[in-house]
Amino acid sequence: MQRVTSYLPAGTPSSHPIAQVKLPHDLRHLRRKLLHLENGEMVMLDLKDPVLFANGDLLVRDDGELIEILAADEKLFEIRGRDRTHLVELAWHLGNRHLAAQIEEDRIVILRDHVIRAMLQGLGAVVLEIDEPFQPARGAYHSPGGHSHGHDHDHNHDHGHDHAHDHNHGHDHDHEHGYEHEHEHRHDRGHDHDHKHD
């Protein structure tokens, strides 16, 4: 079986890819995983560090051939505001709830959540159901080049004991669900302190 140990960011001048792998956004955070390609073949991804891949990134096989990563269509909400200021306000409300969001000039795209849709409509937003690839904005902990190295968790579900944890949160992750997870650790709960001064 061919192995992949390196990659090229989308837009890098290169030869034409010989195959493609289609993944939703939450399965594009990878380090080591057996990937099933669109042509029916398989390849073992084995990178040194976890990477959050974007649509169009290229995996480099050991023989030099390229495999293109494609963002799969997902069930999403398209959010539009009355104007840009209103859209910024809507983005603030979504960010305050730690939701993954794809923010564009005239719209915001999120995963479907009917509770959030009701909230947004209450704020005057127009919310439409769409099926498109999802490329949410990366958090502040990701590198400027758009790829995450060394800070996030790598969950390898093909090899349940190979975990790359760069910091200890006091719990183990050993899932058998056959997919990767991108975890954001939220530190806004359980830290509500009252400071009383005499």
Swiss-Prot record:
GO terms for cellular component: cytoplasm. Residues 137-198 are annotated as: Disordered. Keywords: Chaperone, Cytoplasm, Nickel. It is found in: Cytoplasm. One of its GO terms (molecular function) is nickel cation binding. GO terms for biological process: protein folding; protein-containing complex assembly; urea metabolic process. Transmembrane segments: none annotated. The keyword Cytoplasm applies. Residues 149-198 have a biased composition (Basic and acidic residues). Pfam families: UreE_C, UreE_N. The keyword Coiled coil does not apply. Belongs to the UreE family. Involved in urease metallocenter assembly. Binds nickel. Probably functions as a nickel donor during metallocenter assembly. This is Urease accessory protein UreE. The lineage of its organism: Bacteria, Pseudomonadati, Pseudomonadota, Alphaproteobacteria, Hyphomicrobiales.
